[in-house]
């Protein structure tokens, strides 16, 4: 059976977040089981144009890249038209990473036109707040969704969601009968070992991600400044993508008295070192509700837990069950609740923290294995399972 993969960006593309990372993890998991695919994507990366031999999508897979230009964030390039049409025509089934970008739109339309089986991973594209924002403020984009995106999605054999919130958003737009495959993203953990506890006094936290409102870091910093102790430290690592928001972030840095350090973008090896030097990863996405944006999953949470790092996360993502799983603390989307979670973290004994660390790593091994989760998606994509469209409740729902 010939399987095609369409993505806007693929690893090691720099600057495009978790979608490219997730595409690589899933395809490599399939390759480890002997499943071979053909990948079509743009050559876009903010540091250079990718070449097929650079792409990290698994051994034995064919990679076809087209030239991206103009609207490079959306993977625009006229070469996508023949490349994606050819892929859809020659494939028995196609897996599409994302919605509303140039290659993803083409793939959905071509699959529908050719009568091909296809699955679409939303990657946050229909999160409730995101849809509400488009409807209210972006009439041209909303028209694009109505005319092109939604009709194609309704022809998919399954919509791949990673959390209950993402599932609710998809069904709100596409209808209650929309066939949902709810399976979380996996994380590659086998080459990693849980790191020992950080040395030195104080509580050490880290935030990994873009400095933007969707991530909620400024709201979290305001909470942090209210409760931090003299020896506590917070490190922020990630690019700035919003000048106004970044100015506010810099003002908060100045108020921190050196307790907050900004390191900018870090390569993967340095990210892992930062996690190892921290007691907790923080993911406050959605804490600043103005603008209504938040993440659908949060791959960085899984990556942190793979290194034995418990987490502090805002509720409403894929991680509301971290306390039940004893892998961290969850807080409501308010600064007051974030302060409460921070105080709980500050009060932990070394033994209590070590238990959270152990359970975080164990959770990843049991629930977020990319090969096992990838097989669930593969079976639906290839019609090898009796898929009914009822969500498969996996680790993302923590129940």
What residue spans do the PLM features occupy?
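Short hydrophobic beta-strand element within catalytic cores of glycosyltransferases
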Residues: 301-306, 310-314
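Membrane-proximal helix-turn-helix segments that form the acceptor-binding/catalytic region
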Residues: 85, 109, 113, 126, ...
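Conserved donor-binding/catalytic core segment of Leloir-type glycosyltransferases
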Residues: 160, 198-215, 221-226, 235-237, ...
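Conserved acidic donor-binding segment of nucleotide-sugar-dependent glycosyltransferases
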Residues: 324-336, 344-350
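Glycosyltransferase donor-sugar binding loop
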Residues: 45-46, 187, 208, 233-248, ...
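Acidic donor-binding loop of glycosyltransferase active sites
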Residues: 157, 276-296, 309
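Carbohydrate-associated surface elements
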Residues: 165, 186
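Nucleotide-activated donor-binding/catalytic signature segment of Leloir-type glycosyltransferases, i.e.
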Residues: 246-272
């Amino acid at each position: 059976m010939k399987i095609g993969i369409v993505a806007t960006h693929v690893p090691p593309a720099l600057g495009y977040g978790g979608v490219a990372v997730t595409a690589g993890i899933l395809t490599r998991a399939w390759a480890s089981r002997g499943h071979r695919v053909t990948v079509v994507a743009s050559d876009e990366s903010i540091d250079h144009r990718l070449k097929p031999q650079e792409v990290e999508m698994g051994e034995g897979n064919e990679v076809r890249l087209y030239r991206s230009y103009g609207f490079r964030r959306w993977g625009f390039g006229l070469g996508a038209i023949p490349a994606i049409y050819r892929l859809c025509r020659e494939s028995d089934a196609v897996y599409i990473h994302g919605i509303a970008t140039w290659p993803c739109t083409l793939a959905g339309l071509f699959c529908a036109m050719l009568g091909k089986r296809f699955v679409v991973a939303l990657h946050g594209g229909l999160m409730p707040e995101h849809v509400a924002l488009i409807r209210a403020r972006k009439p041209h984009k909303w028209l694009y969704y109505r005319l092109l995106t939604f009709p194609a999605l309704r022809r998919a054999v399954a919509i791949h969601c990673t959390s209950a919130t993402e599932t609710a958003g998809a069904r709100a737009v596409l209808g209650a009968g929309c066939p949902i495959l709810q399976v979380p993203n996996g994380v590659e953990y086998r080459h990693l070992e849980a790191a020992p506890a950080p040395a030195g006094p104080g509580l050490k936290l880290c935030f990994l991600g873009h400095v933007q409102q969707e991530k909620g870091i400024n709201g979290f910093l305001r909470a942090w400044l209210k409760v931090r102790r003299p020896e506590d430290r917070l490190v922020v690592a990630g690019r700035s993508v919003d000048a106004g928001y970044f100015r506010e972030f810099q003002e908060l840095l100045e108020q921190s008295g050196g307790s907050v350090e900004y390191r900018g973008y870090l390569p993967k090896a340095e990210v892992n070192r930062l996690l190892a030097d921290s007691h907790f990863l923080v993911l406050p996405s959605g804490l600043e509700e103005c603008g209504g944006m938040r993440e659908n999953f949060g791959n960085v949470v899984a990556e942190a837990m793979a290194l034995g790092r418990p987490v502090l996360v805002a509720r409403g993502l894929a991680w509301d069950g971290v306390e039940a799983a004893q892998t961290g603390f969850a807080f409501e989307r308010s600064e007051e609740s974030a302060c409460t979670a921070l105080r709980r973290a500050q009060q932990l004994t070394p033994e209590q923290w070590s238990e959270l660390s152990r359970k975080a790593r164990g959770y990843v091994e049991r629930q977020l294995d990319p090969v096992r989760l990838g097989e669930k998606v593969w079976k639906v994509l290839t019609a090898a399972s009796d898929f009914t469209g009822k969500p498969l409740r996996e680790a993302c729902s923590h129940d």
